[in-house]
């Protein structure tokens, strides 16, 4: 088993190995399948953004389409929740906001070379 490591510096948290390669591949496959069915959006159309600023393509996973994504992303969401709860407990975010946090929507974003600095963004 690969060791999970955490580094928080100036409120930027790096959680290595919390999301496995297998979980990443499931998210990518889900995105690609949803893109084939035209269930993704781009920010040029959605936000009326200039092609020079935003060109990425996104899939939004939420309660309205949980039947599409939950089984594929369940283990990733558990690990994301572990990392997120560690972060809010160790940065003062829980006290700063004063209300419980809830996941409402997961965005899987594909950004190609020259479109930004991420290849994949969750």
Residue spans for each PLM region:
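Conserved short histidine dyad/triad with adjacent acidic residue
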Residues: 108-122
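Non-heme Fe(II)/2-oxoglutarate
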Residues: 2-100
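Acidic, glycine-rich loop-and-strand cores that form catalytic or ligand-binding grooves
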Residues: 97-112
